[in-house]
Amino acid sequence: NIANRINAVKDWLSLPEEQRPHMITFYMPEVDHEAHTYGPNDPHVEAAVKFVDSSVNALQATLATLNLPINYIFVSDHGMTKVDNDNTLGMPKAIDTAAFRVPWGDALIHLYAKEESKIQSTYDALKKDSLISVFQLDETPDYWHYKKKDDIYQRLGDLIVVPHLPKVFNFSTRKTTLGKHGFDNHHPDMRASFMAWGPAFKKGLIIDDFENVNVYPIVAKILGLDYNENNIDGKINVLNSILQPIPSTMKAAKHN
């Protein structure tokens, strides 16, 4: 119940200052759920967007009664695109599953070689398929951050196979959903949302696209948290210009 969730936030912010949370996250799954099920341009998604919009309005109106300097950051973690779920791609014939471990995927699949001698021949065979693109790690676009130097946890496959939209992979007998994400983050449909308002933010700005990792540094700055720039991906200079000057009296807490 959205009213109960909003009232819970109000109750938390009504606590004595020493007990009051300084950051609250509030996830709303409705748009994601409907867009996966029906595709991003369906009336069900429009209704879900209107529900979220009215809920944010209700949240703001409820919290305004507390007379606190509340900042709001409204984000989505990904975009959504409509795929061809009637004609999905199965396991490419060029992939020998005895020679590769292939976990499930739809927007891309990773091929983990059991036999390194099979990598090049499989790569060459997959390159001939007009419905997909195949990459060795050092061929992937820089902005994917999918190269060997980025793979500090050794999660990436020896080969990465990407279907050409609107195609997607489906290794199941069950029909896949109409809406998907996880594709190339330069694709317009993969763009996420960002809005921010409150006393910490300048008003009326329209800004250029940026990567979501850059939200963290401004949240930390607003909260007065210190952090090691070498330990995070985001950069404060990307969004710093949207912030009002932070009072010099604000004391930074250590955040390790």
Name each model feature, range by range.
Residues 3, 43-50, 113-117, 209-213, ...:
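Soluble non-cytosolic domains of exported or imported proteins
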Residues 104-218:
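Active-site neighborhoods of enzymes that stabilize oxyanions during catalysis
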Residues 1-18, 215, 235-242:
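Active-site-proximal alpha/beta segments of enzymes that process anionic O-linked groups
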Residues 2-15, 31-72, 121, 219:
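A long, amphipathic alpha-helix that forms part
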Residues 21-30, 48-52, 56-59, 70-79, ...:
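Beta-strand elements within well-structured catalytic alpha/beta cores of enzymes
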Residues 69-70, 78-114, 252:
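Acidic/histidine-rich catalytic neighborhood
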Residues 231-256:
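Long, internal low-complexity/basic segments
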Residues 36-39, 84-87, 172-174:
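Short, solvent-exposed loop/turn and secondary-structure capping segments
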